[in-house]
Amino acid sequence: MADEQQTLDQQTPEQPTGAAEDLTARVQELEEQLAAAQDQALRMVADLQNVRRRAEQDVEKAHKFALEKFAGDLLAVVDTLERGLEMSDPNDEAIKPMREGMELTLKMFDDTLRRYQVEALNPEGEPFNPEQYQAMAMQESASAEPGSVLKVFQKGYLLNGRLLRPAMVVVSKAPAETPPSIDEQA
């Protein structure tokens, strides 16, 4: 009987050790699954925040640039009024009332465009900026810095800082050096 008790004592501690190892392995496996689930949950929360942020940005851009097509269409009207004023004689008494009406209409258009963050680009004398201006021609000029805008054919416009229409310009270039004449060479 003592032998049986001793055998039982020897077997009993080993069984809990095997079960403990199984439980430890199971706990470790569950902890890994929990960590993976927590990581996945964090990623999903981050993805949701990114989607929400992108949606808010899209709505903001839609509000900001909803007027783009409409404002672009109005620019032709502004251009026509400006050309009409340029072509008319300010000293002609017969058209003075019509000219004043055109000036007031143009001022109202300009004020309205400014109210909706449509900004005119009139770059005469400024350095050429290919992101905002379109060069229609190059002209030699001794008085202007090479690469600067000499003349504006058509003003450009920005809507909330974004290019709506580039300014059509003439850009200056350095005068060509004249070759020495035959008399100078001799």
Curated annotation (Swiss-Prot):
<keyword id="KW-0346">Stress response</keyword>
<dbReference type="GO" id="GO:0000774">
    <property type="term" value="F:adenyl-nucleotide exchange factor activity"/>
</dbReference>
<comment type="similarity">
    <text>Belongs to the GrpE family.</text>
</comment>
<dbReference type="GO" id="GO:0042803">
    <property type="term" value="F:protein homodimerization activity"/>
</dbReference>
<dbReference type="GO" id="GO:0051082">
    <property type="term" value="F:unfolded protein binding"/>
</dbReference>
<protein>
    <recommendedName>
        <fullName>Protein GrpE</fullName>
    </recommendedName>
</protein>
<keyword id="KW-0963">Cytoplasm</keyword>
<dbReference type="GO" id="GO:0005829">
    <property type="term" value="C:cytosol"/>
</dbReference>
<feature type="compositionally biased region" description="Polar residues">
    <location>
        <begin position="1"/>
        <end position="15"/>
    </location>
</feature>
<comment type="subunit">
    <text>Homodimer.</text>
</comment>
<dbReference type="Pfam" id="PF01025">
    <property type="entry name" value="GrpE"/>
</dbReference>
<feature type="region of interest" description="Disordered">
    <location>
        <begin position="1"/>
        <end position="20"/>
    </location>
</feature>
<comment type="function">
    <text>Participates actively in the response to hyperosmotic and heat shock by preventing the aggregation of stress-denatured proteins, in association with DnaK and GrpE. It is the nucleotide exchange factor for DnaK and may function as a thermosensor. Unfolded proteins bind initially to DnaJ; upon interaction with the DnaJ-bound protein, DnaK hydrolyzes its bound ATP, resulting in the formation of a stable complex. GrpE releases ADP from DnaK; ATP binding to DnaK triggers the release of the substrate protein, thus completing the reaction cycle.</text>
</comment>
<dbReference type="InterPro" id="IPR013805">
    <property type="entry name" value="GrpE_coiled_coil"/>
</dbReference>
<dbReference type="InterPro" id="IPR009012">
    <property type="entry name" value="GrpE_head"/>
</dbReference>
<dbReference type="InterPro" id="IPR000740">
    <property type="entry name" value="GrpE"/>
</dbReference>
<dbReference type="GO" id="GO:0051087">
    <property type="term" value="F:protein-folding chaperone binding"/>
</dbReference>
<dbReference type="GO" id="GO:0006457">
    <property type="term" value="P:protein folding"/>
</dbReference>
<keyword id="KW-0143">Chaperone</keyword>
